[in-house]
């Protein structure tokens, strides 16, 4: 999946990420850009407009929770399937989330990182993070196979 150099680069960069801010923005953007994903978050209250979604405290809190899990995965890049096994089971068996949504969220996360870090988020880092989010999406979809 990732070379030792790529792992070092993404891990070092991830230390700069403000998980609470980036998580809320990434989940919010997912819900705005792909509105069908909102059906999994009906208990979150008002998701009727982009502003409502982006300012919703439950979206922000869950986005942080999602990125806290992602951060844990960043510490276990060699065992993403093991790291995300319980979450894969939850999302498959109980929540019935379409695994394609994991790919969408990963891609949105990469966009949010680029937006927040500008030139510091180089094309090489973007390519490395695309590998990471693909690996995480695959690990989360593992239970579906």
Curated annotation (Swiss-Prot):
InterPro entries in the record = Globin, Globin-like_sf, Globin/Proto, Hemoglobin_b, Hemoglobin_oxygen_transport
Positions modified as S-nitrosocysteine?
92
> A single GO molecular function, which one?
oxygen carrier activity
Give a GO biological-process term. hydrogen peroxide catabolic process
N6-acetyllysine modifications at: 58, 81
Which PANTHER family does the protein's record reference? HEMOGLOBIN FAMILY MEMBER, HEMOGLOBIN SUBUNIT BETA
Record's keyword annotation contains Flavoprotein: no
* Protein keywords: Acetylation, Heme, Iron, Metal-binding, Oxygen transport, Phosphoprotein, S-nitrosylation, Transport
CDD domains, per the entry: Hb-beta-like (cd08925)
User: Which species does this protein come from?
Assistant: Bos taurus
Where is heme b annotated to bind? 62, 91
Q: Which Gene3D superfamilies match?
A: Globins
- Complexes and interactors: Heterotetramer of two alpha chains and two beta chains.
Impact of changing residue 20 to G on the protein?
A: In allele D-Zambia
Q: What is this protein called?
A: Hemoglobin subunit beta
* Functional note: Involved in oxygen transport from the lung to the various peripheral tissues.
Signal sequence extent: none
Residues recorded with modification Phosphoserine = 43
Q: In which tissues is it expressed?
A: Red blood cells.
Q: Which residues carry this modification: Phosphothreonine?
A: 11
Which segments constitute the Globin domain? 1-145
Q: Name one GO cellular component term.
A: hemoglobin complex
Q: What superkingdom does the record give?
A: Eukaryota
| UniProt record similarity statement | Belongs to the globin family.
């Amino acid at each position: 999946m990732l070379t030792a150099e790529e792992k070092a680069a993404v891990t070092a960069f991830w230390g700069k990420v403000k998980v609470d801010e980036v998580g809320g923005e990434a989940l919010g953007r997912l819900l705005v850009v792909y509105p069908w994903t909102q059906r999994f978050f009906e208990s979150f209250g008002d998701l009727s407009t982009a502003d409502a979604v982006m300012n919703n405290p439950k979206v922000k809190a869950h986005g942080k929770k999602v990125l806290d899990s992602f951060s844990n995965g960043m510490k276990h890049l060699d065992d993403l399937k093991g790291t995300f096994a319980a979450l894969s089971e939850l999302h498959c068996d109980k929540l019935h989330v379409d695994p394609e949504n994991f790919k969408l969220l990963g891609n949105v996360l990469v966009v949010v990182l680029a937006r927040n870090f500008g030139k510091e988020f180089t094309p090489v880092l973007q390519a490395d993070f695309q590998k990471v989010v693909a690996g995480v999406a695959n690990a989360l979809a593992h239970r579906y196979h």
